[in-house]
Amino acid sequence: RLGTWIGGDRDGNPFVTLKVTEEALKIYSNQIIQIYKEKIVNLSESFSISTLYADEPRLLMSKIKNYSNLLNKEYRHYTKINFDEPFRIFLSLVFHRLDNFQKNKKGYNSFSEFQDDLNLFENEVNKCFKNNSSSLDLRYFIDYVNQFKFHGVEMDIRENADVLRFNEDFKKEYSEFTTLIKRIPEWKKIYGDTVISSIILSMTKNEKDILNLFKFCKKLIKNKSDIPMLVPLFEEIEDLEKSHVIISNLFANKDYKKHLTNFNNNQEIMLGYSDSNKDGGIVTSQWS
């Protein structure tokens, strides 16, 4: 797993807006999709097998036919030059759906659509070929895709607890953070369910801060399984010293404990003792 908070760290940085976060997600997505496109080209050469020498993949041919409207120009081109190579035709059409992702209606609407196409392709390969050296390469690629999805890296969203304490000084930040949280389910659908791995709450002072964030997310996110891991970041000496008590109190909340079942009952925490800008000072932070 690769993670980043570049594009998602809003704490104290007014330049990290919702637009910046969305642009960062697109940049990461474009990078991983470029890798997928290159691999699809290689696989299409490996599976350039004529139906004269293999069973006809009927489900795959049906899906190719379904793509004749969406990818009409591409469909006519590949069915003409590779007329007896359905596996190659299908992967060529998959390439164009990847190439048009987030550009126009020809592209995939979600990661799950791409995943379904790959699973269909693999199932048809396994039915039509008993022993094919390229099948293992295909399986490795699908495992790779299932790991990195359409996001490549998992982004952390980071915000200061003061924003959720209804402080008048943070009205603008509160409003934009609200809009961002609402977008998480959409991002998960487009890029894959692990695109936003966690929401980090800096300057967490007590369990109420995390429970406040939890309540905030429940109000804005319809499907509760779409709520990411909520991570307290303890930064000041007093908060670090009582962090174990705060976590124990947090776990005592039944609703929150149920939320953790979505993460195999794991809870991430962050310790900010290395930050010399907090009350511990530079000597304490370096000593730690």
Regions found by a protein language model. Give the residues of each.
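Expand to "…catalyze enediolate/carbanion chemistry for C-C bond making/breaking, isomerization
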Residues: 7-10
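Extended, charge-enriched "interface" segments that sit outside catalytic cores
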Residues: 45-190
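Active-site cores of enzymes that catalyze phosphoryl transfer or operate on phosphate-rich substrates
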Residues: 130, 135-215, 219-222, 237-287
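Extended active-site and interfacial segments that coordinate phosphate-rich ligands
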Residues: 18-42
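Conserved, mostly hydrophobic/aromatic
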Residues: 12, 149, 232
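Extended, Lys/Arg-enriched charged tracts that mediate electrostatic binding to polyanionic substrates
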Residues: 1-2
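A conserved P-loop NTPase coupling/switch region
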Residues: 223-227
